[in-house]
From Swiss-Prot:
Keywords, sorted A to Z: Cell membrane, Membrane, Transmembrane, Transmembrane helix
Family: Belongs to the UPF0056 (MarC) family.
InterPro entries: Multi_antbiot-R_MarC
Annotated S-S bridges: none
Membrane protein topology class: Multi-pass membrane protein
Top-level taxon in the UniProt lineage: Bacteria
GO cellular component: plasma membrane
Predominant subcellular localization, coarse grouping: membrane
Cellular localization per UniProt: Cell membrane
Origin species: Chlamydia pneumoniae (Chlamydophila pneumoniae)
Name of the protein in its database record: UPF0056 membrane protein CPn_1010/CP_0843/CPj1010/CpB1048
Transmembrane segments: 7-27, 39-59, 61-81, 105-125, 137-157, 175-195
């Protein structure tokens, strides 16, 4: 039970739904609240479908392209590093709200890469490859984290009114620090295993 809770929390942090709230608020601000809820639900379902495909066929896909998991870990960690830096240096949310968008987003950029990014995919494939936890536990933890992320995003308009711009900015930067640490850990893990250096522990 503790393992499931820890994995669920890890995946929830990797989904970074609180940090994604400013993006959703900016892209969906011109729609009614009911329309926003429908779009968020649809995009989260798209993201879940993509994750299930990666969990089911991810290893075969990378083997077909002759891509090692360690390379994906290193590159995924680097991409996550750049994302975390942008999150920590994020401008005030109202700057992102200046751009008026009347086009309804479909899959990109909300489902991917905002909800389902390289961090989540890399973590899922890594845990599947390592075999430390069963596929059932990993899959269940992913579903739990996804459900909490969906709930968080559905409440985005409420969080926007409650915390305001400064609260959203502080939350985004806090998750940026957490993702930065995870990105370094992910790169160290990939480098350590790929080159058999042995400095990574955990």
């Amino acid at each position: 039970m503790l393992i499931l809770l820890n994995l669920s929390l890890l995946f929830y942090v990797l989904f970074d739904s609180p940090g994604s709230i400013p993006v959703f608020v900016a892209l969906l601000k011109n729609f009614s609240r009911k329309k926003q809820q429908r779009v968020i639900l649809r995009e989260c379902l798209f993201a879940l479908g993509a994750l299930i495909l990666f969990v089911t066929f991810g290893r075969s896909f990378f083997q077909f392209l002759d891509i090692s998991l360690y390379a994906f870990q290193i590159i995924g960690g680097f991409l996550l590093f750049t994302v975390s830096i942008k999150m920590m240096l994020a401008p005030m949310p109202e700057k992102a709200k200046d751009d008026t968008s009347k086009t309804e987003p479909i899959f990109f950029p909300l489902a991917f890469p905002v909800i389902t990014g390289p961090a989540v995919i890399t973590a899922l494939l890594s845990y599947m490859e390592e075999g430390i936890y069963s596929r059932e536990i990993i899959f269940t933890a992913m579903i739990i984290a996804w459900a909490f992320s969906l709930f968080t995003l559905l409440c985005s308009s409420f969080f926007d009114r409650l915390s305001g711009n400064f609260g959203l900015l502080a939350l985004e930067r806090l998750f940026g620090i957490a993702l930065l640490l995870m990105s370094v850990n992910l790169m160290l893990k990939g480098i350590s295993i790929a080159f058999n250096i042995g400095f990574y522990i955990g």
